């Protein structure tokens, strides 16, 4: 069984972290985030490190222990450095552009798809075939990237569609005569 929860989360320089009962708040150069731990998890700030422990030894408490520690680590990294996810668009005539803050996608449909990002998320289009989603909340950045990819996921025959930059498409062979 993983024991990732045993390791204390170090608070990086330039970030102020505070623990108020179950609520952990982090303030940094990129913004402010908070995480509310489950009642079965105790959170304490000791020697510039956040220590996470289960209240009792139940299986339910131990299962939430490692996740709570990782969530706290994610908010600390988010307010310090932020997160970004890169997407690539492949296909003839498939492209992306920005209209103000909204992302406009030409993906082979009769009309362009217009995506309005939620608050706290920044979308950049360095090239018409590249999209960069960035923000301080790791979950939200991944969710927005997944929603954009969902409009036209990569297909296995030609690889057309929207894919993550690090994603490898398993290609299929076409019909044989």
Swiss-Prot record:
Keywords: Ribonucleoprotein, Ribosomal protein, RNA-binding, rRNA-binding. One of its GO terms (biological process) is cytoplasmic translation. GO terms for molecular function: rRNA binding; structural constituent of ribosome. PROSITE patterns: RIBOSOMAL_L6_1 (PS00525). Coiled coil: none annotated. It comes from the Bacteria. InterPro entries: Ribosomal_uL6-like, Ribosomal_uL6-like_a/b-dom_sf, Ribosomal_uL6_a/b-dom, Ribosomal_uL6_bac-type, Ribosomal_uL6_CS. It holds the Pfam family Ribosomal_L6. SUPFAM superfamilies: Ribosomal protein L6 (SSF56053). One of its GO terms (cellular component) is cytosolic large ribosomal subunit. This protein binds to the 23S rRNA, and is important in its secondary structure. It is located near the subunit interface in the base of the L7/L12 stalk, and near the tRNA binding site of the peptidyltransferase center. Belongs to the universal ribosomal protein uL6 family. Part of the 50S ribosomal subunit. This is Large ribosomal subunit protein uL6. It comes from Allorhizobium ampelinum (strain ATCC BAA-846 / DSM 112012 / S4) (Agrobacterium vitis (strain S4)).
């Amino acid at each position: 069984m993983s024991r990732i929860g045993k390791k204390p989360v170090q608070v990086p320089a330039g970030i102020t972290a505070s623990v108020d009962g179950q609520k952990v708040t982090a303030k940094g150069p990129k913004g402010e985030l908070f995480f509310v731990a489950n009642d079965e998890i105790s959170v304490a700030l000791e020697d510039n490190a956040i220590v996470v422990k289960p209240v009792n030894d139940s299986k339910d408490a131990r299962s939430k222990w490692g996740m709570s520690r990782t969530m706290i680590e994610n908010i600390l990294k988010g307010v310090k450095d932020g997160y970004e996810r890169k997407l690539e668009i492949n296909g003839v005539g498939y492209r992306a552009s920005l209209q103000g803050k909204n992302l406009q996608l030409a993906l082979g449909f009769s009309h362009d798809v217009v995506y309005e990002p939620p608050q706290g998320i920044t979308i950049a289009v360095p090239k018409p075939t590249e999209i960069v989603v960035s923000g301080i909340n790791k979950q939200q950045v991944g969710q927005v990237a997944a929603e954009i990819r969902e409009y036209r996921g990569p297909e296995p025959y030609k690889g057309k569609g929207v894919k993550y930059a690090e994603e490898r498409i398993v290609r299929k062979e076409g019909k044989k005569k």
